[in-house]
UniProtKB/Swiss-Prot annotation:
Identification of the protein by name: Small ribosomal subunit protein uS19
Family statement: Belongs to the universal ribosomal protein uS19 family.
InterPro entries named among the record's database cross-references: Ribosomal_uS19 (IPR002222), Ribosomal_uS19_bac-type (IPR005732), Ribosomal_uS19_CS (IPR020934), Ribosomal_uS19_SF (IPR023575)
Recorded GO CC terms: cytoplasm; small ribosomal subunit
GO molecular function: rRNA binding; structural constituent of ribosome
Disulphide bridges, residue numbers: none
Keyword Transmembrane tagged: no
Keywords: Ribonucleoprotein, Ribosomal protein, RNA-binding, rRNA-binding
Record NCBIfam families: rpsS_bact
Transmembrane spans: none
GO biological process: ribosomal small subunit assembly; translation
Job description of the protein: Protein S19 forms a complex with S13 that binds strongly to the 16S ribosomal RNA.
Length: 91
C-alpha cells in the first residue's frame, strides 16, 4: 500500500540537511545514512548515498528511475546462498 498523496513523501530531517549541504557546496562526497525509510526526491538525483543494510554500508548512486522509491530498496539486507544440490549419489 502506498503513502497518501496529501501527506507527501517522507524524508528524515537529518538526511534532508545533509542533502541540502551537499547541493549548496557542490561536493560529490558520499552521504552516509542509516535512514532506509526515506523516500528519494528529485533533488537527490546524481548524489551517492551509503545506505546501511544492518552489517555494512552499500553505495547507492541515485538516478532518475529511482525517484519515488525508498533508499532501503537498493541495499538488500538478506543474502541468498541458494538451495543445496540434490544428493542423488547418497541413495
Amino acid at each position: 500500500m502506498s503513502r497518501s498523496i496529501k501527506k507527501g513523501p517522507f524524508i528524515d530531517d537529518h538526511l534532508q540537511k545533509k542533502v541540502d549541504q551537499s547541493l549548496e557546496s557542490g561536493s560529490r562526497k558520499v552521504i552516509k545514512t542509516w535512514s532506509r525509510r526515506s523516500d528519494i526526491s528529485p533533488e537527490m538525483v546524481g548524489l551517492t548515498f551509503a545506505v546501511h543494510n544492518g552489517k555494512k554500508f552499500i553505495p547507492v548512486f541515485v538516478s532518475e528511475n529511482m525517484v519515488g522509491h525508498k533508499l532501503g530498496e537498493f541495499s538488500p539486507t538478506r543474502t541468498y546462498y541458494g538451495h543445496s544440490a540434490d544428493k542423488k549419489g547418497k541413495r
